[in-house]
Swiss-Prot record:
Protein name (Swiss-Prot/TrEMBL): Cell division topological specificity factor
Cross-referenced Pfam families: MinE
Keywords: Cell cycle, Cell division
Source organism: Helicobacter pylori (strain G27)
Superkingdom of this protein's organism: Bacteria
InterPro entries in the record: MinE, MinE_sf
Lineage: Bacteria, Pseudomonadati, Campylobacterota, Epsilonproteobacteria, Campylobacterales
Similarity section: Belongs to the MinE family.
C-alpha cells in the first residue's frame, strides 16, 4: 500500500462492508439503554456547530465491558 492509496476514496463495496460491520458490532455489544440516546445527542451537538448532516458512528473494538466508537464527520464545503 502506498501513501496515495491511503487518501483514495473507497468504493461502494468497501463502504457497504464497513456498514455491515457496524451493524454486526452493534448487535453484539451490551444493550445499554443510554447508548442510543447519547449517540443522538452527540449528532445534535455536531450538527449545531458544523452544519453537517453526514455523520457516521463506527464501533472499532468491543468486548464485554468496553465499547469503542469512532465518529466520522464529513464537513460541508
Amino acid at each position: 500500500m502506498s501513501l496515495f492509496d491511503f487518501f483514495k476514496n473507497k468504493g461502494s463495496a468497501a463502504t457497504a462492508t464497513d456498514r455491515l460491520k457496524l451493524i454486526l458490532a452493534k448487535e453484539r455489544t451490551l444493550n445499554l439503554p443510554y447508548m442510543e440516546e447519547m449517540r443522538k445527542e452527540i449528532i445534535a451537538v455536531i450538527q449545531k456547530y458544523t452544519k453537517s448532516s453526514d455523520i457516521h458512528f463506527k464501533t472499532l473494538d468491543s468486548n464485554q465491558s468496553v465499547e469503542t466508537i469512532e465518529v466520522e464527520i464529513i464537513l460541508p464545503k
